């Protein structure tokens, strides 16, 4: 329209509700693929040449900010910015092509692209997609991701669902659950971090792992999680400690769309509920006179 004169086409991946739209600029995703196949047949070298022509500091994608502190902005990030951050954290966490990831968050969000797609280019791990938004929890249990990201609201929703089921359980099962969780809150995070715990508590925790913690991780779909992150908003300390106490290596990170997500990440052995960890390799942070956090590293936002 008049506000976007350079816009030539709008591609829609779900045609439902668009039956009566006849504007020539509206394309279905299937039609776009068909056009691409036809063009590739007529110009067999085009796509290979286009890829070869890309430079590290060319624009790779545009992601929109949330708009919580102002109008949403379109953040342009380069190939170098995305790959650099993906590689830094993949190396830090020893991510390999053996990881399984569940891509269930909105694809327009920078976090989804980084955790599920950009790090895929660096590591070659397997990205799994849920069958539908309604089957995410079921698919998560079936897939058993080893590398996982969830905002606090998702973690809270998963826990609420489990706790509701537990309240419907029998008296003895509820009694056992609460006794095991009391122990987990006291020693679980210390065991996860490899700290010293007396033999009696270790033995009791191992028994609790068989009876409660293991089945609970399985019910959450996290029985195979090796590394899990949360970010996007502050997570309550009780919620954070709960997941870590049952043996899930949940960690916090800090970043933004403009920084390609990763600014600070909690390394193993330095996980606390009141910090977001030290700067990732290649990042410098300084607090300005006005209290703002100033971030410096190669490949920040290219432009708005």
What is the meaning of each model-derived region?
Residues 12, 27, 34-64, 71, ...:
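Conserved pre-ATP/AMP-binding loop-to-beta segment of ANL
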């Amino acid at each position: 329209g008049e506000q976007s004169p350079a816009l030539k086409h709008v591609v829609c991946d779900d045609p439902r509700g668009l039956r009566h739209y006849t504007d020539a600029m509206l394309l279905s995703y299937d039609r776009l693929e068909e056009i691409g196949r036809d063009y590739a047949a007529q110009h067999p070298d085009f796509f290979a040449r286009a890829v070869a022509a890309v430079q590290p500091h060319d624009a790779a994608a545009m992601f929109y900010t949330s708009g919580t502190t102002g109008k949403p902005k379109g953040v342009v990030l380069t190939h170098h910015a995305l790959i650099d951050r993906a590689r830094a954290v993949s190396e830090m966490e020893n991510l390999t092509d053996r990881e399984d990831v569940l891509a269930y968050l909105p694809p327009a969000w920078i976090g989804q692209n980084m955790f599920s797609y950009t790090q895929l280019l660096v590591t070659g791990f397997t990205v799994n997609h849920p069958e539908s938004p309604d089957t995410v929890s079921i698919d998560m249990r079936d897939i058993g991701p080893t590398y996982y990201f969830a905002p606090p609201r998702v973690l809270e929703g998963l826990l609420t669902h489990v706790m509701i089921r537990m309240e419907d359980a029998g008296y003895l099962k509820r009694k056992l659950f609460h006794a095991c969780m009391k122990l987990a809150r006291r020693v679980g995070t210390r065991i996860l971090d490899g700290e010293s715990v007396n033999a009696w508590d270790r033995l009791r925790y191992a028994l609790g792992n068989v009876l409660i913690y293991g089945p609970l991780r399985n019910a959450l779909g996290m029985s195979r999680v090796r590394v899990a992150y949360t970010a996007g908003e502050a997570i309550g300390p009780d919620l954070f400690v709960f997941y870590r106490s049952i043996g899930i290596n949940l960690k916090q990170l800090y970043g933004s769309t403009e920084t390609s997500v990763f600014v600070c990440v909690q390394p193993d052995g330095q996980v606390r509920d009141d910090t977001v960890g030290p700067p990732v390799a290649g990042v410098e942070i300084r607090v300005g006179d006005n209290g703002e956090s100033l971030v410096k590293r190669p490949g920040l936002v290219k432009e708005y």
